[in-house]
A protein has these predicted regions:
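N-terminal Rossmann-like FAD-binding beta1-loop-alpha1 element of flavoenzymes
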Residues: 2-29
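Short loop/edge segments at beta-strand edges and connector loops
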Residues: 8, 79-81, 222-224, 230, ...
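Conserved Rossmann-like nucleotide-cofactor binding loop
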Residues: 12, 35, 257
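Glycine-rich FAD pyrophosphate-binding loop
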Residues: 21-44
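Mid-domain catalytic core of redox enzymes
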Residues: 23, 225-349, 353-363, 367, ...
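Dinucleotide-binding Rossmann-like beta1-alpha1 core, especially the glycine-rich loop
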Residues: 46-123
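Active-site/ligand-binding neighborhood in enzyme catalytic cores
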Residues: 91, 107, 116-228, 232, ...
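C-terminal lid/capping helical subdomain adjacent to the catalytic/cofactor pocket in oxidative enzymes
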Residues: 386-458
Length: 458
């Protein structure tokens, strides 16, 4: 039996903890906040369970992970058909995109210009330096400029030509116009639009993992931010929330920039300088409570235009068949921002007015508005800026040289991955130690290289 300390109780940390526990190890999880789950948690507002934004479990989840989740949740894991919309050219188009719907709703010039882009593609010398370059090369100038460029600026806070091309390779799944056509054909069938979602909200997944881990003898300390990790040849000493613990291994899902601050011996100044150079985009989540049973029939509205503050609007009630109140609904508006900017510092009431103003601009129905609740997330979207890519690579390289301390997960790898990706990271890390005393670093390195191929699914 090996003693393992896991930092963070998001999906990556919890899956690593549960799997390592099942393999016979003594695992303790340290969570800084009062509750588990991270951004994959759910919580209650006025009797309704809501998530930290719009989330869903994709059918592309690897079979071994999907089987695990199905075992944990049973019939509470529901198969649902997506019913979203995206705003393009001041018109609503089905999302995922469907061929007939696009033809019917998008202007003729969009189809013509996109077709010309495809014809010109073989004669254009490609560049993949920036996000704008990468998307233009793959999908053409029209799709890049009308959709991806403004959406990128809205999410990451800087123009698409100042973002590294790696951001597009991580975030944009379509590789060519042909790939879009294939996706259109697939999404035109119900099976191509399905997703999985728990009856009691997205957070039911991490809750089930945590409960099983505890039932198996694992320990989770909440309200326990790790303030120091002291490494030695044979063990590590973890200080967290007034608790001191010795562990043979520390697996950290904390932001890699934070890990550089709390680990001892301290890294070189060059590593600390690199960590300080990287920026992460925050988000304000606005939950508007409405005195009506349903706002629209759609689960999510995607809003790439810079004319609105909201990047995505979701209605949690429409994601599931659950025990939700009949006489009310809640909208969740996702507003990307920088920590400390005007949006971040706004009151709940002011945020609510921003959202209501955006709804009016979009021509959405008038809402029977009651009140607004907010959640402020300081670290959501890692920003792959051209000018700091060397620093990012330096920090990631340092993170793979820490011996008994292993960073992983979205924050540990500075990536924007989906739930099934982060669950896979936790599972693979636990499998790399198996029933032995030491992590097989060769096996783990292979997994890390595989993680670099992950592409976010919307």
């Amino acid at each position: 039996m090996t003693e393992i300390a896991v930092i963070g109780s998001g999906p990556a940390g919890l899956m690593a903890a549960l799997r390592a526990n099942e393999l016979g190890h003594d695992v303790t999880v340290f969570e800084a906040s009062p509750s588990i789950g991270g951004m994959s948690a759910s919580f209650e507002i006025n009797g309704m369970r809501v998530d930290y934004g719009s989330h869903r479990l994709h059918p592309s989840t690897p079979p071994h992970l999907l089987d695990k989740i199905k075992t944990l949740l049973g019939d509470d894991l529901q198969s649902r058909e997506r019913n979203g919309r995206i705003r393009l050219y001041d018109r609503w188009v089905s999302f995922p995109l469907r061929t007939t719907n696009m033809i019917r709703h998008l202007p003729f010039k969009f189809s013509v210009n996109s077709g010309l882009d495809i014809l010109q593609r073989p004669f254009i010398k490609p560049s993949d330096l920036t996000f704008a370059d990468e998307v233009t090369n793959r999908l053409g100038k029209t799709v890049a400029s009308e959709f991806y460029a403004p959406y990128a600026q809205k999410l990451w806070g800087i123009p698409a030509d100042q973002l590294d091309g790696e951001q597009a390779r991580r975030r944009v799944s379509a590789s060519s116009p042909l790939a879009i056509i294939k996706r259109l054909i697939k999404s035109s069938t119900p099976t191509g639009r399905t997703f999985l979602y728990p009856k009691r909200g997205y957070g039911q997944i991490v809750e089930a993992i945590a409960n099983t881990f505890i039932d198996n003898g694992g320990t989770i300390h909440t309200n326990s931010p790790v303030t120091e990790i002291i490494t030695a040849a044979e063990s590590c000493h973890v200080k967290a929330g007034g608790t001191d613990q010795e562990a043979e291994h520390v697996w950290s899902t904390a932001p890699l920039t934070k890990l550089a601050e709390i680990i001892h011996p301290a890294p070189d100044n060059s590593v600390l300088t690199a960590a300080n150079a990287l920026r992460v985009r925050g988000m304000v989540l606005a939950y508007l409570v409405l005195d009506q049973s349903q706002y629209t029939e759609y689960d999510a509205h995607y809003l790439p235009s810079l004319e609105t503050n909201i990047a995505r609007l979701s209605e949690p009630k429409n994601y599931r068949e659950g025990d939700d109140p009949d006489n009310m609904t809640i909208l969740c508006a996702e507003i990307p921002c920088w920590v400390g900017d005007e949006v971040w510092e706004s009151s709940d009431g002011d945020i609510g007015e921003i959202v209501l103003s955006d709804l009016k601009k979009l021509g959405l129905p008038s809402a029977r508005y009651i009140e607004t609740h907010t959640k402020k997330l300081p670290s959501v979207y890692p920003v792959f800026e051209l000018e700091t890519m060397n620093e990012r690579e330096a920090l990631l390289t340092w993170g793979q040289t820490l011996g008994r301390v292993i960073p992983f997960g979205r924050q540990g790898f500075l990536v924007p991955d989906n739930l099934h990706h982060t669950l896979g990271m936790g599972w693979d890390l636990a499998e790399s130690i198996g029933r032995q005393d030491q992590v097989d670093h060769t096996q783990w390195k292979t997994s890390v290289e595989d993680f670099k191929k992950n592409i976010v699914e919307d």
